[in-house]
Amino acid sequence: MEELGVKDSKKMTDEKILQIVPEIIKKIPYKSAILSNKEYNERYSADTNMNKLKAILHNKVLVQLTNEIKNWDYVIVDQFAQPFVYFNYLKSSNAVFKRITFLTKGEDKSLAVACASLISRFIFLKEFNKLGEQLDMFLLKGASDKVDEVGIKIVEKYGFNKLSEVAKLNFKNTDKIKEKISK
């Protein structure tokens, strides 16, 4: 993995991630869970925030992976919430995987976490590109005036409801798009 240059995905370009992750996934077992923007918007609410959604998805893949792979020593999760908060998010889940070591900045401390981060980013990039192809538009990532302009084009071409399928509506971009459209 080190030969491939595995490190924190935030320290790598998207191009490099797209190049090396196919090699990584040939060598290690993994599971993924994709939450579409539409599903995210339906589930996100006053009592369900992004960290709760992440906890639910992390737990889902950990349960699947550890059920399939019996020969493992420990599980590390890049800490995005305090452990008691993480497990509180899962209180209504049927199966909860609990044998977790939480590490802040886990990608810097664990090769396995760095690989998981890269695989997640790879899947995100592939899904993001598919979304752009479906819309017949080049989509931009992040938050900027240019991203807002693309959002406006989506609304003009497909209507505002389409935005809920391609964007997280609780982000500030949505308010800016609504404001610009209403002028």
Model-found features: residue ranges?
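RNase H-like, Mg2+-dependent phosphodiesterase core
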Residues: 1-183
